[in-house]
Regions:
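Short, conserved secondary-structure segments in the cores of folded domains
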Residues: 2, 27-30, 41-43
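C-terminal structural segments of small proteins and small subunits
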Residues: 3-4, 20-21, 45-76
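Short, acidic/hydrophobic/Gly-rich beta-strand patch recurrent on exposed beta strands
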Residues: 14-16, 32, 52-54
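Short alpha-helix capping/helix-loop boundary micro-motifs
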Residues: 21-27
Length: 76
């Protein structure tokens, strides 16, 4: 399942090897988005982009196109 498909308020762990192209992967790693870290989609901005997510203890805004590259495990 992709992070962009996750329902609001549901917490899942980021799946290994799920960050797409190297440039996207390095950007997400810099934000603390690593495999095994819990992630929750909290809300979305008007028109659906970006998404506000909790990654571990941090709150981030992630563009929906970047969230398409983040795979999450089926259950927490």
């Amino acid at each position: 399942m992709k992070l962009s498909e996750l329902r609001f308020g549901v917490t899942r762990r980021i799946a290994p090897g799920s960050h797409g192209p190297a440039e996207v992967q390095s950007k997400l790693y810099a934000l603390g988005v690593f495999p095994g870290v819990p992630v929750t989609v909290l809300r979305e901005a008007p028109f659906g982009d970006p998404l506000q997510v909790r990654v571990g203890p941090a709150l981030l805004s992630i563009r929906r196109c970047d969230a398409e590259h983040i795979r999450v495990e089926a259950s927490a």
